[in-house]
Amino acid sequence: MAKAKFERTKPHCNIGTIGHVDHGKTTLTAAITAVLAARVAGNTATDFANIDKAPEERERGITISTAHVEYETEKRHYAHVDCPGHADYVKNMITGAAQMDGAILVVAATDGVMAQTKEHILLSRQVGVPYIIVFLNKCDMVDDPELIELVEMEVTEQLEEYGFNDCPIIQGSALKALEDPNGPWGDKIMELMDTVDSYIPDPQRDTDKPFLMPVEDVFTITGRGTVATGRVERGTLHLNDELEILGVKEDVQKTVVTGIEMFRKQLDEAQAGDNIGALLRGINRDQIVRGQVLAKPGTVTCHHKFTAQVYVLTKDEGGRHTPFFNNYRPQFYFRTTDVTGVCELPAGTEMCMPGDNVEMTIELIHPVAMEQGLTFAIREGGRTVGSGRVATVIE
């Protein structure tokens, strides 16, 4: 029999499991693949052991263990991330190694909300995970429906505290579904996936977002003008489009694209992922520098001061050997450039140890084009000592 060709006919969506240790995240991940393999064409089951011994990956020098599985429902194709350890989650969410369009929060009905349940909800809010669906696991072990109701209320309250309102809750048992994918507990997994299909909207594709390109290099073509090169981060660019040049300098400059080139060929349009050179009308070589961005007018703003969720690398990951204190002044590497800034630790936090994850306020000496969720590295003398994501923009 000929091999079936992979047809990307369905919308794609990135999701993941979050929640307290031993509440059943990995079992649920395995159960989803097992139930879908039994009920929806085009799926294969991934067993618990393969997800649990997740391979280590290095993302920006940080060691993270993450398991990636894929599966599809009738409606969508999914990439699903699951992390074995709590520290892996924290790193994963802060480095943006796994961008999630939505998350399944696993809460054991036997335990209710625990420390990491809260921490993962907070992290989801900080890094901009837009949707959370709750899977109340181990319901087969709780006989009293009133107890389950109490746990549901507790989870809802916790989610609302961080601005996640009206999150759907599905009751089930991942282990039971894994044992019998076609049974009634398997139905609960299908109910979960139907909810994921309907509650998380189709993600906007990168090409549909407003154009943005970080400038990597600038040079002059004699007789033609100034060219900025870089990789298009999102959106599409057409000849004669108006653009703004922002960041690093205080003022915003306007220009028009009079030429687009890729691999020495002229293009009419460039889109997300392309490495291009853009010829900019009326801009001198010294008016634009690496680290600025080209963006569709009015879509991006520059800021000096913001709060961020930061993970500080351990000594083993090549980070600092010693803690840092308030008013620490490292470099912040955004997209293509380093900017010096000052860290203000939260009230009551005296210092930040290697391996910590902390929310801090940062003030940069130059403005940077930013929005919530933008990732950056913290560097000292060229080596990465931390990783962060913008949580809120202040000024």
UniProtKB/Swiss-Prot annotation:
SUPFAM superfamilies, sorted: EF-Tu/eEF-1alpha/eIF2-gamma C-terminal domain, P-loop containing nucleoside triphosphate hydrolases, Translation proteins
Leading EC class: hydrolase
Region G5, annotated ranges: 173-175
Keywords: Cytoplasm, Elongation factor, GTP-binding, Hydrolase, Magnesium, Metal-binding, Nucleotide-binding, Protein biosynthesis
Chain residues that bind GTP: 19-26, 82-86, 137-140
Chain residue ranges for the region called G1: 19-26
CDD domains: EF_Tu (cd01884), EFTU_II (cd03697), EFTU_III (cd03707)
Region (G4): 137-140
Any Pfam family: GTP_EFTU_D3
GO cellular component terms, semicolon-separated: cytosol
Protein function: GTP hydrolase that promotes the GTP-dependent binding of aminoacyl-tRNA to the A-site of ribosomes during protein biosynthesis.
Summary of subunit composition and partner proteins: Monomer.
PANTHER family: ELONGATION FACTOR TU, MITOCHONDRIAL (PTHR43721:SF22), ELONGATION FACTOR TU-RELATED (PTHR43721)
Protein name: Elongation factor Tu
Annotated organism of origin: Agathobacter rectalis (strain ATCC 33656 / DSM 3377 / JCM 17463 / KCTC 5835 / VPI 0990) (Eubacterium rectale)
Biological classification of the source: Bacteria, Bacillati, Bacillota, Clostridia, Lachnospirales
